[in-house]
Amino acid sequence: MGNGECLEGGRKAAVILTSSRHAIAFTGAGISTESGIPDFRGPQGLWRRFDPALASIDYLNTDPKGFWEFYIERFRVLNNARPNKAHLALAELEKLGIIKYVITQNIDNLHQSAGSINVIELHGNYTTVYCMRCKTQYPFTLALRKYEEGENPPRCPKCGGILRPNVVLFGEPVNEINRALEIAALSDVALVVGSSLTVYPAAYVPLVVKEHGGRLIIINLEPTDYDDYADVVLHCSASEALDLVLNEVKGIMAAGN
């Protein structure tokens, strides 16, 4: 999509958002690639290089040492990442009263780092770990330090149980999905950013908005199966598209005052 098409799509999206009553953002891995975090299913995606089974609860239970060897490198990448313009734009749209919730599939904590307040994390957050035995929670940096000191798997200082990341692994339920779907059913606009809408049940969230008579905006570099279902589609980078949308929203709001 060229700059002209992105600009036109950004304007249309801004009009929809400024006229909304309760808009939500739904974000996937594509919003964080510009922060240096690889996505999962793209050409350089994580699951093209590694077996997804390495991120399963079964693997953690059967080989916690191997699990941590795989995850520690990914967590180091997350720990070094910083919010990009797309995260910052969503946070500003929330401050302007446009976006009511950010519902994310990501575990990278970048929405909170950018200043978003109402964030629902469907798949958890990498910044904490907890003991599989006593459930005591600790900062991820404690597990990282223990691992770097040669303790693999890292263990709970309190009871000696194995520590695990506070994220949803393959084979585990998505506990926050019901809350997200309830919010979606009350919303009139879903702004999808950086998601191919192929991972369920998470992908149901923006679709519920549309099914309840709301509007659907999709910002994703690659086409999705729901592009024809959407009201506006922008095949642009997340930061470029959201920068356009934010500026257009500000212009519309200024003109209305």
UniProtKB/Swiss-Prot annotation:
- Asked if the keyword Nucleotide-binding belongs to this entry, the reply reads no
Q: Which residues form the active site?
A: 123 (proton acceptor)
Q: Which residues bind NAD(+)?
A: 29, 33, 40-41, 105, 107-108, 123, 195-196, 220
Provide the cofactor note recorded for this chain's UniProt entry.
Binds 1 zinc ion per subunit.
State the reactions this protein catalyses. N(6)-acetyl-L-lysyl-[protein] + NAD(+) + H2O = 2''-O-acetyl-ADP-D-ribose + nicotinamide + L-lysyl-[protein]
E.C. designation(s): 2.3.1.286
User: Which residues are noted in the entry as Zn(2+)-binding?
Assistant: 131, 134, 156, 159
Q: Which Gene Ontology cellular-component terms appear in the entry?
A: cytoplasm
Gene3D superfamilies linked to this entry: SIR2/SIRT2 'Small Domain (3.30.1600.10), TPP-binding domain (3.40.50.1220)
Q: Which UniProt keywords apply?
A: Cytoplasm, Metal-binding, NAD, Transcription, Transcription regulation, Transferase, Zinc
Q: Where in the cell is it found?
A: Cytoplasm
Entry-linked InterPro entries? DHS-like_NAD/FAD-binding_dom, NAD-dep_sirtuin_deacylases, Sirtuin, Sirtuin_cat_small_dom_sf, Sirtuin_class_U, Ssirtuin_cat_dom
Q: What does this protein do?
A: NAD-dependent protein deacetylase which modulates the activities of several enzymes which are inactive in their acetylated form. Deacetylates the N-terminal lysine residue of Alba, the major archaeal chromatin protein and that, in turn, increases Alba's DNA binding affinity, thereby repressing transcription.
User: In its UniProt entry, what is this protein called?
Assistant: NAD-dependent protein deacetylase
Q: Which organism is it from?
A: Caldivirga maquilingensis (strain ATCC 700844 / DSM 13496 / JCM 10307 / IC-167)
Q: What is the lineage of its organism?
A: Archaea, Thermoproteota, Thermoprotei, Thermoproteales, Thermoproteaceae
